[in-house]
Each structure stands twice: as C-alpha cells, then as structure tokens.
Amino acid sequence: MRIRTVGKTGLQVTELCVGTSAIGSMPGTYGYSVGEDQALDTQRLVSRGPIRFIDTSNEYGVDGSSERLIGTVLRELGGVPEGFLVATKVDPDSTGDFSGRRVHASVVESQTRLHMDRLPLVYLHDPERIS
C-alpha cells in the first residue's frame, strides 16, 4: 500500500482509508445494523491490515459509538499502532451549535471515546449545516 503525505502537515497516510460510520450501527442510513462484537472484530482486523488510516466521527452511531468501539480496540492494542492514523470529525450538538466552544467539546468527547490524548487529524463534519 502506497503512503501519501497530507499536504504540508507531515502526516503520513495510506492511499486508502477505512470509513467507520457503519460500525456505529446506523440502520437508518445503511439499512442494516452492526452488532458490537462484529464491529470490534472488524476494527481488530483493520488494525492488522495494510490500510493504516481510519476515518470516524463524533456523530457516527448513538452517542459516538463508532469512536467508542475504535477506542476499545486501541486500548486493547496499547494505543494507536505505529504508522497508523485515526482521523475524526467535530460535529454540532443537537441544536446545531458549531461554535468554538462546541468544537472544543466535540474534540474532548472524541479524545475520551478514542482513548487518545492527541487527535492528529480533525475535520468539521458537514459544515454546510450552519451556512
């Protein structure tokens, strides 16, 4: 798997990224549910595979369940594996608040669920919702 550098950040990622919204079990979006055991097994397999880049979001699943499940596996592994990058997204709250305070709170929520002190790559999720 080829590695690319993200702009001028120095962050290295594989050319492919594993999206993780489905492991948050979002049947309204995908038409099927994903059980917790299946989600954890999927993330364990991803951690051993050639794709070293995961994309998740504070908003995937109920109460950030996608991040929580990824965090469970990261904790089992003793942290983020060498050469692996976890990216997440900040999301507005249920009122649509996308203020600086909300962005900070979203980052802290993600750090807690993912068991990561530092998030190397964070996106704004669907910022058109506030325009």
Language-model region placement:
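Basic side chains
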Residues: 2-4, 81, 89, 113, ...
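Small/flexible residues
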Residues: 4-6, 91, 104
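Structural motif corresponding to the early beta-alpha repeats
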Residues: 77-98, 125
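Active-site beta-loop-alpha junctions enriched in small/polar residues
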Residues: 21-23, 57-59, 89-93, 124-127
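Generic beta-strand or strand-like secondary-structure segments
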Residues: 69-73, 89, 102-109
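Glycine/proline-rich, positively charged
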Residues: 94-131
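N-terminal binding-site loop/beta-alpha segment at the start of enzyme catalytic domains
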Residues: 1-84
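Non-cysteine beta-strand/loop elements that form the S-adenosyl-L-methionine
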Residues: 14-19, 87-88, 116, 120-122
